Amino acid sequence: GYGYNDLGRDTLEKVYADIFHTEDALVRPQITCGTHALGTALSANLRPNDKLMYISGKPYDTLEEVIGIRESVGSLAEYGVLYDQVDLLENGDFDFEKIKEKITPDLKVIGIQRSKGYATRPTLSVEKIGEVIKFIKEIRSDIIVMVDNCYGEFVETIEPSDVGADMVVGSLIKNPGGGLAPIGGYICGTKECIEKCAYRLTTPGLGKEVGANLGIMGTFYQGLFLAPTVVASALKGAIFAANLFAGHGFKVIPD
């Protein structure tokens, strides 16, 4: 039940840390979905009177209740975490001027949503994310930058963690699970951030030491092995279908 000394689990987390070029990783079936992973990462690294700011506009609908944009029991707002937001410019770029203006002493975490989600704005490239992280770190190097990497894994040859993100967060039932992982999520990042995330996911003092894999660890490894091929096929299919329908006069994304 405890899952102590699970070599398969611990090795998988080393593999994720190696792939994402981070100090540590938390990859668990106990993380039920992407929203759960994001909620864990945020609540682990924010304290009362700290401020969270999203600089890619309003996040996914499901995160609104996590943050407290929409009132919800147990939200970050209920625990005294402040929230601010900077929308993207009309052309889809980051609003550097507004971001600089809103970097206040109480700002602890900056969130970036890589995917367009349910909006029609452009998805953010790793290059663009890297530029804004560099800009932020030059102003205040202690700010934690968390990137919601859902739907973005293995789409490019590098990940947000390669360009300065302190945490990258996602779901195994999306890209990195390769269509095989039945549940799970991951958080990759600095040793300090991941330790806090592990204590939040399980309990203080236990952290990464507990968490049985319940016999599904094989699907996590196999899914990760297949993930780049599955993602490439999905991208090719999307581009092909978009061009097919564009040829018949439909407005499409990607165009």
Name each model-derived stretch:
Residues 17-41:
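Short loop-beta-helix segment that forms the pyridoxal 5′-phosphate
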